[in-house]
Curated annotation (Swiss-Prot):
A motif ('HIGH' region) lies at residues 43-54. It catalyses: tRNA(Leu) + L-leucine + ATP = L-leucyl-tRNA(Leu) + AMP + diphosphate. A motif ('KMSKS' region) lies at residues 634-638. This is Leucine--tRNA ligase. It comes from Treponema pallidum (strain Nichols). It comes from the Bacteria. It is an enzyme of class 6 (ligase). Pfam families: Anticodon_1, tRNA-synt_1_2, tRNA-synt_1g. GO terms for molecular function: aminoacyl-tRNA deacylase activity; ATP binding; leucine-tRNA ligase activity. Belongs to the class-I aminoacyl-tRNA synthetase family. NCBIfam families: leuS_bact (TIGR00396). ATP binds at K637.
Amino acid sequence: MGYPFRALEKKWQAYWRDKRVFCVSEDERFPPERRAYVLDMFPYPSAQGLHVGHPEGYTATDIYCRYLRMGGYNVLHPMGFDAFGLPAENFALKTGTHPRVSTSANCDTFRRQIQSFGFSYDWEREISTADPEYYRWTQWLFLKLYEKGLAYEATAPINWCPSCKTGLANEEVRDACCERCGAEVTRRGVRQWMVRITAYAERLLSDLDELDWPESVKQMQRNWIGKSCGAEIDFPVDAPACSVHDKLPQTIRVYTTRADTLFGVTYLVLAPEHEAVTALTTHAQRAAVQAYVQRAAKKNDLERTDLAKEKTGVFTGAYVRNPINDMRIPVWVGDYVLVSYGTGAVMAVPAHDQRDWDFATRFGLPKLTVVSADYTATVPNSNSPQGAVLQRCVSDEGFVVNSGAFNGLASADARERIVAHLEMRGAGARRVTYRLRDWVFSRQRYWGEPIPLVHCPSCGVVPLPESALPLLLPETADFTPTEDGQGPLARARTWLRVPCPQCASDAVRETNTMPQWAGSCWYYLRYMDPRNKTAFCAPEKERYWAPVALYVGGAEHAVLHLLYARFWHKVLYDLGLVSTKEPFARLVNQGMITSYAYRRKNGALVPHDEVHTNAQGTYVHARTGEKLECVVAKMSKALKNVVNPDDMIAAYGADACRVYEMFMGPLEASKPWNTQGLVGVFRFLEKIWVLAGRVAAANGIPQDSRAEPPGDLHAQKKSCSMYALETLLHRTIQKVTDDTSALSFNTAISQMMIFVNEATRVARRMPLPSKMWEMFVKILSPYAPHLAEELWEMCGHTHTIAYEPWPQVDPARVAPHVCSVVVQVNGKVRDTFSVAPNAPNEELEQKARETAGARKFLGTQQPKRVVIVPNKLVNFVL
């Protein structure tokens, strides 16, 4: 009989479900070190369903969880759905269905597909962020932020997506476009709710060092937080040069990390949104400045700071004085300066900053050299009597020049001295700033958590009492976004108008909704206690499971979900609601599973159905006959190269798909899908099935194959073969144990393939002992659980293999036959030699002396002492 994978998978998935095999509780018999919370980043349920890339991370965590259970761990492994947000709402708008209906249907599809892989999730803990019983606690947690002063209302220029008709956080903008729909983002002033994530910037930065995360992700967060140590410097306004204005500031404050270049400032640049622009602008320059400010308002931050674009600006007509030397310098407006960073004003040092150089070159402004690689008394400048000698900007540090009493100091020393001088005069002060901006926490859309606040004419903003939660989304047929930035909830008149919770007068509800990230900031906590109606999570359950021991998901969430969740968690920690400072102890980013695509000479990719293979085996365009290059690309509906897991499971089975996805390469690496590789893995499982049949047919086989070889030569050869196979099994167990612990699944599978090939060869000549076979089935079970359960039952067992103890290795069988010993002379490697394990020190020293390297570097000298590390090292100290 062939390998009946369809019947096996249906049988064992029903068994796991009906027997509640993977439902877990807070069993106190497991000590803290034997508890593990393993989590996948939960999916948002798109209409397209899963493609074969989605289950990669899910398969990895499932293998790891099954391995831990067999190792005696109590494992929490849940799954749910990130169901609120723009993707779900945009699909509903496109299809004309209500998002509640379409999202529910999409969740059903995702659940069916995920379950078809046989993942060992505790489905009784399933959550959905769009479930009122869930978002009740999202609203409750938001109110905690509000009470703590971390949520506030503001009208400010934000990233606006004209297609999605909503504001976007900086983290949701990619290359000046909306991350979700790809539309070009503009700037727009909209009333928003903001969350003060900047209050936690330093802790978010410093605590990264404690996390077992990929260094690349930690560095992305460090860069996004963008800590900068510098100084704020006040430039007095030269009042006579400015137009008369009742709000004329006395000084313009700038932030700089290069106070050592203060003598080289030749102009100031204000962001177009800077509050002093109007007051500083002279009458003669007013029209030009106003026109420039209006043009700048249409650009997003990425456009404005693009180094490749030509700098633009306009002179205000105003001047300020340099506080270090009283030089009179002009004030310009330039959109390459952002009001959201530093003070919204920069001191321009074109000789030592490339952006300032480009700006000065464009507008003919002077460039003063004040830092030199080698100190000399004077260095000519572009406006010096010697003429224009500067050919390029030099941003490196060095020694300050043309800087009065500070000449000759190294840049770092000059910074300290100049800032101290300014502080003494009250013209400056040291300051730490961060690139991180407060989080835009509201969306002008329908499908999200309603914000539980009321606007009262008398009382202002009033939070809803806890008894009024959850504040439900109103049922409405018209959920299309508006153009005025108010949001669809403003049209729900009955829902909108409500008595003020504080004074009972007429009030209106907040019409913005929360962003998709709100529900995903804390979902890992709800899994610990998903049915609790009196708290988001009981403290004793949080203490039992926290923190998440292993979190697996995409690196694209580095400065979105992962940063937001860390911030949210730290707030909860400060409120005494969680017991750990960080939510995720270890993070692993799985690589992307890509697909093959075909590229024309002009770089355009061609859909699969337009590609043919000619008689020479070359890929050609079906219509034009043009030769095509086969490349690796992201799976795309447009390219028609998306691989549906339903089709693969139907043809080859869930176990084959699981094993193949892990066998493709290292978990963290991107790799292309190749169905022929899946066929190869399917044949591997078929081979195991055939081998199992041989074992089952050999009833009454001896359980101990380790007896001494008998005298009969033929029997002796058979016994030696079995001994060698058992040795290979123990080495396989060791390899699979080590690699599964390290999430190196591809090499574990390779080792199992080696064992199966050898076991198949041996089994043709003699029966395999059932004890040996059962040990192999155990290590196979995390990888191919359906097949392993059936093989376990064939061995005569009536209970699941899922909680069987992981097989132990016989140390004698895995010890190396020889050791490689390093020979050093005075700590430097000079040679190596091989020796039997645990050789005595006398033998190690003698063999080391006999090596060519030792003879060359010792010569006739006698070492003062010999340092020996058994099995590893001999070091001669002269």
